[in-house]
Design a protein with these regions (language model features):
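Aromatic- and carboxylate-lined catalytic core of secreted/periplasmic carbohydrate-active enzymes
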Residues: 353-355, 367-478, 492-503
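Exposed aromatic-hydrophobic patches
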Residues: 83-86, 485-491
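Active-site mouth of glycoside hydrolases
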Residues: 122-332
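Catalytic-core region of carbohydrate-active enzymes that cleave or remodel glycosidic bonds
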Residues: 317-390
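Non-catalytic, glycine-rich low-complexity segments
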Residues: 29-67, 72-75, 113-116, 434-435
Length: 504
């Protein structure tokens, strides 16, 4: 006869049984590995798919570490999936609790560990020392950007080709549109639209298409892996689908959705518009509102700018972090630095190319000259390329491959700038030739079109070595001896040279 014994439940076993589902849920909601500081933690929960979750469901989370609390908006990703992304800015344990107007999404709790960043993770870029930029870990960041407006709206193979081109290119910032673009050399339908679109070309602005944003996120992550900042253009006038003419409430909802999805990527910058003054139907008050939405919705304070065609949007407004400039009036750099007291980036100083447009037909030599002249006056520069192509595959719009000769020269300049003072260099007021310097330590002059056989210089006390730099030939030639005070330096007598002095 078999005898079975039944154990009487204890308080401990009852409590363990009650907590088991909670423990399992927390384990499922916590990452298996720590999240690096400044990287992305992502929580995904299952929720309602019926109705219109984009409008009907509110979802967010509060992240806590000791006395700190950070509120982060979540978003609906389709298929009943709700996500919230968070980029921890401190190491250690973080806890969270979700908030929602739907019971199944509300009050979900969990925790994760933030670990030390890896060697390639320097954190997000922000303004430092008024006119410059730096990574969160203290490393200086000198922007050397390029433009590919519609590269993420191309066939997948071309998008990947663009990534492979960038892998070998000198650029560490990419200007790119969120919305597709319709303009000369770029009149193609995108593979996916940001909003559902009917056969009659009507947009359903009450919903988003998650697949559109999945692709964008993949490309932003690839840029991050290459050390490239993604300068995302949120609005532009070159429209074919109605995105430049959306009602105000749709504009606002779009901005909040984009911030919820993308702000946790540490390499994201916000460019509120490309050529803001050409976007018809929007007033200055609208652009002010967009900036305020970014400020209020973005818990990380990513960099914010706005690009112009003619008149600038007022760069002194507090929500503008740096000045995005179209043009080549480098003589105004000292005036703008004094007036705006913010970093200046000539994101568009015209493009290397040969198209029948004045903005897209400068030579590689002239692009190289503009990079040197702008930087020697205290600004940062941006590249673009517009060479005619039988299939209209121009880098400036669609990406693909680079054909020009300026990128190699830009790489050469970037190496010179990044090997300079870690604290950066400032323009020297009243210098005979444009010059940026770390006073008493390091001087970089650009002689532009001047071609002296003997060049006059005036350095402070101490001794300095001199090097003659040819930006086009990409050579650095040491001069014999050391120099101090007022003197003449023997030069090759050719234009577009630079001279670097470093204290011995």
């Amino acid at each position: 006869m078999k005898c079975e014994m039944t154990m009487k439940p204890t308080r401990r076993t009852i409590l363990a049984g009650a907590l088991a589902p909670l423990a399992a849920r927390l384990a499922a909601q916590s990452p298996a590995r720590p999240i690096e500081r400044w990287d992305r933690f992502e929580l995904q929960l299952a929720g309602p798919a019926e109705g219109n979750p984009f409008l009907d469901v509110r979802f967010s989370a509060e992240f806590r570490q000791q006395h700190r609390s950070v509120q982060v908006d979540g978003f609906y990703d389709g298929g009943g999936a709700y996500k919230v992304r968070f980029a921890p800015d401190a190491e250690g344990e973080w806890s969270y609790v979700t908030r929602s107007n739907r019971r199944e999404l509300d009050g979900q709790t969990g925790a994760f560990l933030s670990s030390a960043p890896s060697a390639r993770n320097r954190g997000p870029v922000s303004v430092r020392n008024t006119y410059d930029f730096g990574y969160a870990d203290g490393t200086p960041y000198f922007p050397f950007g390029t433009t590919c407006y519609a590269w993420t709206h191309q066939p997948a193979a071309r998008q990947q080709q663009t990534i492979e081109t960038l892998r070998q290119a000198p650029f560490n910032k990419m200007r790119m549109c969120v919305f597709p673009k319709w303009y000369t050399y770029n009149q193609d339908e995108p593979p996916v639209y940001p909003f559902p679109r009917s056969a009659q070309d009507q947009n359903d602005y009450t919903r988003f298409v998650p697949e559109f944003f999945h692709n964008l996120e993949t490309r932003i992550a690839q840029l991050q892996s290459l050390g490239i900042e993604a300068d995302l253009i949120l609005f532009h006038p070159y429209d074919h689908w109605g995105y430049a003419l959306m009602p105000p409430e749709v504009d606002d909802r779009y901005l909040r959705y984009v911030v919820a999805r993308l702000a946790a990527f540490r390499n994201v910058w916000w460019s509120v518009a490309n050529e803001w003054d050409l976007v018809k139907g929007k007033k200055t008050a609208d652009w002010d509102r967009y900036f305020r939405i970014l400020q209020e919705s973005d818990p990380y304070g990513r960099l914010r700018s706005i690009h112009h065609s003619g008149p600038m949007y007022d760069p002194t407004k507090p929500w503008v972090t740096h000045v995005s400039i179209q043009g080549d009036d480098f003589a105004k750099i000292p005036e703008w630095r004094a007036a705006f007291r913010k970093p200046l980036i000539f994101d568009e100083c015209k493009y290397e190319g040969n198209i029948p447009k004045r903005w897209g037909d400068i030579s590689a030599r002239e692009m190289t000259r503009r990079f040197w002249l702008g930087m020697a006056n205290g600004a940062y520069m941006g590249h673009g390329e517009t060479y005619l192509d039988a299939h209209d595959i121009l880098w400036w719009s669609k990406g693909g491959v680079l054909h020009g000769e300026s990128p190699r020269r830009i790489a050469f300049l970037r190496g010179i700038i990044e090997s300079g003072p870690a604290e950066g260099a400032a323009p020297v007021t009243g210098a005979y030739y444009p010059c940026i310097a770390r006073a008493g330590e390091h001087y970089l002059y650009f002689l532009d079109f001047h071609q002296p056989a003997l060049a006059d210089f005036d350095l402070p006390g101490g001794r300095f070595t001199a090097e003659i730099i040819d930006p086009w030939a990409m050579t650095i030639t040491p001069a014999e001896g050391t120099f101090s005070g007022k003197f003449q330096l023997k030069m090759p007598g050719k234009e577009m040279l630079a001279v670097r002095f470093r204290k011995t």
